[in-house]
Amino acid sequence: MNEKVILFTAGLAFIITVVLSPIFIPFLRRLKFGQSIREEGPKSHQKKSGTPTMGGLMILLSLSITTWLMSDIFFERTAHTYMLLFVTVGYGLLGFIDDFIKVVMKRNLGLTSKQKLAGQLLIALIFYFFFQHYSMSTVVSIPGTDVSLDLGVAYVLLIIFMLVGGSNAVNLTDGLDGLLAGTAAIAFGAYAVLAWNQGQYDVAIFSVAVVGAVLGFLVFNAHPAKVFMGDTGSLALGGAIVTIAILTKLEILLVIIGGVFVIETLSVIIQVISFKTTGKRVFRMSPLHHHYELIGWSEWRVVVTFWAVGLLFAILGIYIEVWV
C-alpha cells in the first residue's frame, strides 16, 4: 500500500462530507434541530442559538463509508477495522441520543450523567471483550523509553478510563466554531502517521478517513458556523481517537498528541476544585477556550491559537515515538 491510497482515502472522505452537508444542513434546519446556547456563556454566543446541530452524523457517515470502501478495495477487513467502527459509531449513537433529548425533547441537560456514563461503560466493556477475544497485548509502554508494564486483566480499567475520560475530554473541546474539527484533524493525522509507520494500514486508513471527514465538516463549521457537530460528533471522535491509541499501543502518547483535549479538561477540573475549596475561580470561565474569549480574544484568534498548539503537540508526539 502506498501514500496515494492514504491521500485518496482522505480526499474521498472530504468529498463525501462536502457533498452531504448542503443537503443535510437544510434538512436539520427544517426539523428545527437547533443548538441551544447556555445563558451563562459568552454573550457573543447567543447569536448562534438555533444553528443546526447533530452535524456529527455527516462525519460518521462519511468516515464509515470511506473506511468500508477502502478496506474492501485495498486490503481484507481486520478486527481492528470492526473495533474502530464499533466504538466510533457506538459513541456517536450515544451522543445522538443525548442531542436528540436536548434538541427535540427540549430537555436542556440531555442524558443524565449516570445514563451517559452507563452507555460509555457498556461500549468500553464490549470493546474489551473483543480486545481479549483477539488476544491483543496488555503491555503499556512509556513513550521515548524502554520502560513497559504488562497490566494483564487490569488493562480493562485502562480501557474504561481512557474511553470515558477521552470521549468527555474531546467533548469539552467542542465549544467554538471549528475548534474541535481542526484539533481533531491534527490529532488523527498524527496517529495516521504513526499507524502507517507501524505497518498498521487498517488503522492508518481509518485515521485518515476521519481527517478527511472532519476537514470536510470544517468547511461548514468554521466561523461563522453553519452547523455544529453536537455530542453526536464529539463523543464519536473521542471514542475513535482513544481506540486508535489503544490499537497502536500508543496509549500514553495520547496525553501528548491530544494535549489540547487534556488542557481543556484540566482547566475544568482546576476550576471546579478551586471554586469548591476556596470559593474563587481560577479562570473567567471553563473550559479554557471560553476564558480567552472573556479576556478579549476574538473567537477566531482562540481557535487558530489552539490549532497551532495542537499541531505542536502532534509534532512532539511523532518525534518522541519515531526518533527518540
From Swiss-Prot:
Mode of membrane association: Multi-pass membrane protein
Catalytic function, reaction form: UDP-N-acetyl-alpha-D-muramoyl-L-alanyl-gamma-D-glutamyl-meso-2,6-diaminopimeloyl-D-alanyl-D-alanine + di-trans,octa-cis-undecaprenyl phosphate = di-trans,octa-cis-undecaprenyl diphospho-N-acetyl-alpha-D-muramoyl-L-alanyl-D-glutamyl-meso-2,6-diaminopimeloyl-D-alanyl-D-alanine + UMP
One Pfam family recorded for the sequence: MraY_sig1
Superkingdom of the organism of origin: Bacteria
Entry's EC annotation: 2.7.8.13
Primary enzyme class: transferase
Main location: membrane
Pathway stated in the Swiss-Prot or TrEMBL entry: Cell wall biogenesis; peptidoglycan biosynthesis
GO BP terms, alphabetized: cell division; cell wall organization; peptidoglycan biosynthetic process; regulation of cell shape
NCBIfam families on file: mraY
PANTHER family in alphabetical order: PHOSPHO-N-ACETYLMURAMOYL-PENTAPEPTIDE-TRANSFERASE, PHOSPHO-N-ACETYLMURAMOYL-PENTAPEPTIDE-TRANSFERASE HOMOLOG
Role played: Catalyzes the initial step of the lipid cycle reactions in the biosynthesis of the cell wall peptidoglycan: transfers peptidoglycan precursor phospho-MurNAc-pentapeptide from UDP-MurNAc-pentapeptide onto the lipid carrier undecaprenyl phosphate, yielding undecaprenyl-pyrophosphoryl-MurNAc-pentapeptide, known as lipid I.
Name of this protein: Phospho-N-acetylmuramoyl-pentapeptide-transferase
